Curated annotation (Swiss-Prot):
SMART domains: PUA. This is Glutamate 5-kinase. GO terms for biological process: L-proline biosynthetic process. It comes from Shewanella amazonensis (strain ATCC BAA-1098 / SB2B). Substrate binds at residues 54, 141, 153.
Length: 379
């Protein structure tokens, strides 16, 4: 694609259940066609669009006549299985009005965890976009269990943005954006128009949606924004009912809260470490190790580990945790958990005598690590 609008050549649009139902129990087809019109307009102007859509369970309930069912995983998966076909049919019909075809990708965390499957999903996305087809992504709720679920479509959309190397991620919701206080409780709450850095004070501002139909609140949107912007993707959180919201966002008009992308984004493999695999365990670090890996770009050595949590194998993804409980980095383990329990707190020259082998001094190498928060001083 050679064309772009305001520098955007590829955009991911995430639509939450509250947007698609307009707060009701049914899909709001009139609003969906308006959103399809805006996305089709982008496609016609040369901007590629990937749609991440919620609403399968709501569509399933509607199609089955709103049955009264126990709130179990099996029944949620039943509704998702019925509703997903209705949801993709609705989108297919709506985009066909504008001469566009759609292609469906149903993903689970397992598709993102495995590097080969991750790359295959990326190839499929790129192939669809190359043919002018709108990829429509949803989590495969009909088969996903707690262990393999991404968990919410906010985080799924961030991972989709990384998969397809998007320039912009729009998280469209039932809120106007991120406020400096809860607008439902504070009438004088003000919209935050632009965010350069995501820190603990900003996370405290993130509240939840009141619709009750979706799984994502403002906190999950902030998580998604943090993932995407680290990969060089700009993010906008805005109301899906704001007039011409998609067009305005792409033309950089004042709408919602815009999160600026980090200027030096992660390379592809580190993007996958950040957003793909589920962390299988945690390494607790002393403050010296935290400063070394976050501020000085060092690999993690066994000496700086004060505790090991979880069971994991060599190559699994881990969270690195500061003494005050903050996750400061993610990285790939060079030793399994059983071995790390033996060498935690030990000097590197003690690894081989203790284990009978060694894979090098680094427990997590800096090339296999993504720093999330800088703590300490660079020296």
């Amino acid at each position: 694609m050679n064309s772009s609008v305001q520098g955007y050549r590829r955009v991911v649009v995430k639509l939450g259940t509250s947007v698609l139902t307009s707060g009701s129990k049914s899909l709001d087809k009139a609003h969906m066609v308006e959103l399809a019109r805006q996305m089709a307009g982008l496609m016609k102007s040369g901007v590629e669009v990937v749609l991440v859509t919620s609403g399968a369970i709501a569509a399933g309930r509607e199609h089955l006549g709103y049955p009264v069912l126990p709130d179990t995983m099996a029944n949620k998966q039943l509704l998702a299985a019925v509703g997903q076909s209705q949801l993709i049919l609705a989108w297919s019909q709506l985009f066909s009005i504008y001469g566009l075809h759609v292609g469906q990708l149903l993903l689970t965390r397992a598709d993102l965890h495995d590097r080969e499957r991750y790359l295959n999903a990326r190839d499929t996305l790129n192939a669809l976009l190359a043919q002018g087809i709108v990829p429509i992504i949803n989590e495969n709720d009909a088969v996903a269990t707690t262990e393999i679920k991404v968990g919410d479509n906010d985080n799924l959309s961030a991972r989709a943005a990384l998969l397809c190397d998007a320039d912009l991620l729009m998280l469209l919701t039932d809120q106007k954006g991120l406020f400096d206080a809860d607008p439902r409780k504070e009438p004088n709450a003000r919209l935050i128009p632009e965010v350069e850095h995501i820190d603990d004070s900003l996370r405290l501002l993130a509240g939840g949606s009141v619709s009750g139909l979706g799984t994502g609140g403002m906190a999950t949107k902030l998580q998604a924004a943090d993932i995407a912007r680290r990969a060089g993707v700009e993010v906008i959180i805005a109301s899906g009912h704001h007039p011409e919201v998609i067009k305005k966002a792409v033309h950089r008009e004042a709408v919602g809260t815009r999160f600026l992308a980090i200027e030096s984004p992660l390379e592809s493999r580190k993007q996958w470490i950040l957003a793909g695999p589920k962390a299988k365990g945690r390494l607790l670090l002393d403050i010296g190790a935290v400063a070394a890996v976050t501020c000085r770009g060092r690999s993690l050595l066994s000496k700086g580990i004060t505790g090991v949590e979880g069971q994991f194998e060599r190559g699994d993804t881990l969270e690195l945790v500061s003494p005050d409980g903050r996750v400061v980095a993610r990285g790939m383990a060079r030793y399994q958990s059983q071995a790390l329990n033996l060498i935690a707190g030990k000097h590197s020259d003690e690894i081989e005598p203790l284990l009978g082998y060694d894979y090098g001094d680094a427990v997590v190498h800096r090339n296999d690590m993504v720093v999330l928060e800088m703590i300490g001083e660079a020296k």
